[in-house]
Structure formats: structure tokens, C-alpha cells
From Swiss-Prot:
Mapped ANK repeat ranges: 45-74, 78-107, 110-144, 148-177, 181-210, 214-243
CDD domains per the UniProt record, alphabetical: SAM_ASZ1
Transmembrane segments: none
Subunit: Interacts with DDX4, PIWIL1, RANBP9 and TDRD1.
Pfam families from the UniProt entry: Ank (PF00023), Ank_2 (PF12796), SAM_2 (PF07647)
PROSITE patterns referenced in this protein's UniProt entry, alphabetically: ANK_REP_REGION, ANK_REPEAT
Gene: ASZ1
Name of the protein this chain belongs to: Ankyrin repeat, SAM and basic leucine zipper domain-containing protein 1
Length: 475
């Protein structure tokens, strides 16, 4: 009896009989036929070896222990299974071994699924993508949410894994699901500043108008987190990318998502009109039509072109001369945002007349750009709704935004009138001050003229927006 007990104790590696297959792993039991050893000590020892093998990622030892009878769904600390642990470290080879041994890909602990664990893993995107692909191939549900109502695609978007996001959508993940705070995958990507994720989600049909529980859209979230490039991208009126992949089959979508750049150049599966019609118009309008084929080959849309940085221009083969043309055109088209955080430092009592005049001129120029932009939109809008080619959301969305614009313009007009009254009051006081040396009449007349032009411009802009609003309501 004592001898039997001694035979069951762990021994040093290499001390087993020659028949043992576990010499190098120090499994340490000799009598495999003993029911007592099978029921008690060997199983506990195997579990301990299994945990250590999982920790160091020893796939061959894990496979050996699984073959010896260790349960593939045995639980570790916090109730995690081996598969969940392997997914958390993005060990694709280990995930494959465990799945092939029958591990449950749909296991969850406290509303934490293995797929969510894989999507939020710390590792290379290549390894995470392989893990996610393996789990999806074993029917892991991509729409099961955690306790915070976050789904796998939200975690992937938050962490910047573009290919993982696309793969999840190809397997049925809902793009516009919202978590407990009203965040979508697009909102998370905008918050974290992942431009490529934002572009991909728009292409996959993400709704950029969905608001969080505190009433913020993805563009506003991006702006609040100082991701101005993404803010401009999401604020762009046209959206040729939206829903671009929604009509494809699952197989075609996966093929499109996972092909290399060279494959995309060889096999471009989308309609050039749908993806590049507006781009061609833009390029022809500024005399750069020779760039059309180049941008098509690289799958660059107008939205992407308008948000490119200088290094991206060079990387995509756009010459310095062409870059200057594009940037010059954008400077004319875009309304430069006034940094009001800086105005508090500029508008002081010591401000010179020239500086204040420059501020008013800049404000007037901004209003002029806005008026031109609205005029262009009005002339470009089709009179008949049947002539609208691109996919449009409900006109009610546009009408509500126009109403808000009209209100903002009215507020701006009111504030400009207040500014004019304050300046007029200061001017009258100075004219009545006997100690003040009068300026030349020409300067006074010029300042008054600038104020009048500013007020007229703002009122004119409000009138144009009112006309635009009526146009949408008529439609």
C-alpha cells in the first residue's frame, strides 16, 4: 500500500520508467493503471501542468495533456476557460488547437464572450484577425454584447483593427448597434481617432447621424477629442462610401476585405460611377483628370482625397504640382474654422484698430464663403427627386439641419447687430470727448462701411438658408 502511494508521488523529470511518454514534461506519475491515481492526484497534477503550459504557450504540451484526458473546457481563475485565455493573448495557434479539441467557441463568463475577448486582446492585428476568424468559423455570435452592451465590432473599432471590423460585418455583425451610452462602432472609432476605421465603417453602412445618450453625433465626438480630420470627414455632405458593401454577398464581402492591394488593382469589383463619379467631376473641374486612373487603382474616394495629408499625397504618387492645385482648391472651398479659444487672447482692451478690423474682415470673408457654398448647393440640387442618383437619407434630416442653420444665422445676425451698436456707442463717445483728437473722416467712413457690409452679408446668408429650407420642404 505504501509502495503504491510512493509510486504516485511526483518525481523529477527523467526519473520515470522507460515506458513513460512524459519524461520531458515532468508529469511525474508512474502507475497509469491505478484507479486511485487516475481519480485523484494525476488529474490535479495534469491540471496544474495544463495551467503552466497555457501560461507559457506550450502548444505541444497542451495537445499532449488534452490527449491524456484533460477537459478542454476546464476552468481557471475567474472562471475562464483555456480558449478564453488563449483568445485574450491572441495566440492563434493555441486557439486552433483548443477548437479542434472541441472547445466551446460560444462560452461566456459574466457576459464576456470569447469573441469579445479576442477583439479586445493585446497583440498584433494579424494574430487577432486569425483568432476572430477561427471563432467565427465555429459559429461564435458576433452580435452578443457584454454587460456594457458593447459588441465585438465596437471593441475592434475602439482598438483600431480595420480588418477585424470588416470581417465581423461580413459574418453578420450589426454596424449600428449602440452600447449603454449610445456609442456605435463609428462613434468609438471617431473618439479614438482611427481614420481608416471610420472610412471602412462608412463603407459598410454605418449611420453617422446616430447620437449618443447625451445627444452627440460621431463628428462631434471626434471634434471634442481634437480629431479634426475625422470631424471634417464626417461633416462632409456627400457620402459616396456609405453602404457600399451592403449589397454584396458574404463571400464577396470577405474577398473584398481581405484582398491585398495588388489584388484590388487587378480586380476592382465596384461600379466606378458609384465610387468615383463625384471624384471625376472634382478632378476635371481643377484640370487634374489625369489623376483619375491613379486614384481608382488605389481605391481613393473624394472623401479620402479631401482629408489627405502631405505625406499621403506623396505616398500615393501625386506630384508636388498637383498637390498644390488640390490644396489651393480646398483652401477656396473649405471654410476655415475660427479658433475661438485663441480669440480670448486677442480681443483685449489693448487690441489695435487694425487687428480688430482684420478680425471683422475675416469674419465677413467666412460669411461670404458660406453664402457661396449654399448658393452652389441650391443650384446643384435636382428639382425632381427622381433625378437623385446617390442614396439619400430621409429629407426630414436635411430639413431639420436647415432649420437649425437658420436659427444659428438669426442668432449670429443678432450678435453682429449688438456688436455694431457697441462700436457705434464707442464711436459716439469718442466724437463727443473734447480731449480726443478726431481721426480722418475717411477712416471712420471705411470702418462704418465694413460693419454695414458684415451685417448685410449675415442677413443675406440667413435669407439664402431660408430659401434652402423652403426648397427641402417643397421636396
Amino acid at each position: 500500500m505504501a509502495a503504491g502511494a510512493l509510486r504516485g508521488l511526483p518525481v523529477a523529470g527523467g526519473g520515470e520508467s522507460s515506458e513513460s511518454e512524459d519524461d520531458c514534461w515532468e508529469i511525474g506519475y508512474l502507475d497509469r493503471t491505478s484507479q486511485k491515481l487516475k481519480g485523484l492526484l494525476p488529474i490535479e497534477e495534469k491540471k496544474e501542468k495544463f495551467k503552466k503550459a497555457m501560461t507559457i504557450g506550450d502548444v505541444s504540451l497542451i495537445q499532449e495533456l488534452l490527449d491524456s484526458g484533460i477537459s478542454v473546457d476546464s476552468t481557471f481563475q475567474y472562471g475562464w476557460t483555456p480558449l478564453m485565455y488563449a483568445a485574450s493573448v491572441a495566440n492563434a495557434e493555441l486557439v486552433r488547437v483548443l477548437l479542434d479539441s472541441g472547445a466551446n467557441a460560444s462560452f461566456e463568463k459574466d457576459k464576456q464572450t470569447i469573441l469579445i475577448t479576442a477583439c479586445s486582446a493585446r497583440g498584433s492585428e494579424e494574430q487577432i484577425l486569425k483568432c476572430v476568424e477561427l471563432l467565427l468559423s465555429r459559429n461564435a455570435d458576433p452580435n452578443v454584447a457584454c454587460r456594457r452592451l458593447m459588441t465585438p465590432i465596437m471593441y475592434a473599432a475602439r482598438d483600431g483593427h480595420t480588418q477585424v471590423v470588416a470581417l465581423l460585418v461580413a459574418h453578420g455583425a450589426e454596424v449600428n448597434t449602440q452600447d449603454e451610452n449610445g456609442y456605435t462602432a463609428l462613434t468609438w472609432a471617431a473618439r479614438q481617432g482611427h481614420k481608416n476605421i471610420v472610412l471602412k465603417l462608412l463603407e459598410l453602412g454605418a449611420n453617422k447621424m446616430l447620437q449618443t445618450k447625451d445627444g452627440k453625433m460621431p463628428s462631434e465626438i471626434a471634434k471634442r477629442n481634437k480629431h479634426h480630420e475625422i470631424f471634417n470627414l464626417l461633416s462632409f455632405t456627400l457620402n459616396p462610401l456609405e453602404g457600399k458593401l451592403q449589397q454584396l454577398t458574404k463571400e464577396d464581402t470577405i474577398c473584398k476585405i481581405l484582398t491585398t492591394d495588388s489584388d484590388r488593382e487587378k480586380d476592382h469589383i465596384f461600379s466606378s460611377y458609384t465610387a468615383f463619379g463625384d471624384l471625376e467631376v472634382f478632378l476635371h473641374g481643377i484640370g487634374l483628370e489625369h489623376l483619375t486612373d491613379l486614384l481608382k487603382e488605389r481605391d481613393i474616394t473624394l472623401r479620402h482625397l479631401l482629408t489627405m495629408r502631405e505625406d499621403e499625397f506623396t505616398k500615393n504618387g501625386i506630384t508636388s504640382e498637383d498637390q498644390q492645385k488640390i490644396l489651393a482648391t480646398l483652401k477656396e472651398l473649405q471654410v476655415e474654422e475660427i479658433q475661438f479659444g485663441e480669440l480670448s487672447e486677442e480681443i483685449k482692451l489693448e487690441i489695435s484698430g487694425d487687428e480688430f478690423l482684420n478680425f471683422l474682415l475675416k469674419l465677413n470673408k467666412q460669411c461670404g464663403h458660406l453664402i457661396t457654398a449654399v448658393q452652389n448647393i441650391i443650384t446643384e440640387l435636382p428639382v425632381n427627386s427622381q433625378k437623385i442618383t446617390l442614396e439619400w437619407a430621409s429629407p426630414r434630416n436635411f430639413t431639420s439641419v436647415c432649420e437649425e442653420l437658420v436659427n444659428n444665422v438669426e442668432d449670429l445676425s443678432e450678435e453682429v447687430c449688438k456688436l455694431k451698436d457697441v462700436i457705434q456707442k464707442l464711436q459716439n463717445e469718442r466724437e463727443n470727448d473734447p480731449t480726443h483728437i478726431q481721426l480722418r473722416e475717411e477712416v471712420s467712413t471705411w470702418n462704418s462701411r465694413i460693419l454695414k457690409r458684415t451685417a448685410i452679408t449675415v442677413c443675406g446668408f440667413g435669407f439664402l438658408l431660408f430659401i434652402c429650407k423652403l426648397t427641402f420642404q417643397r421636396k
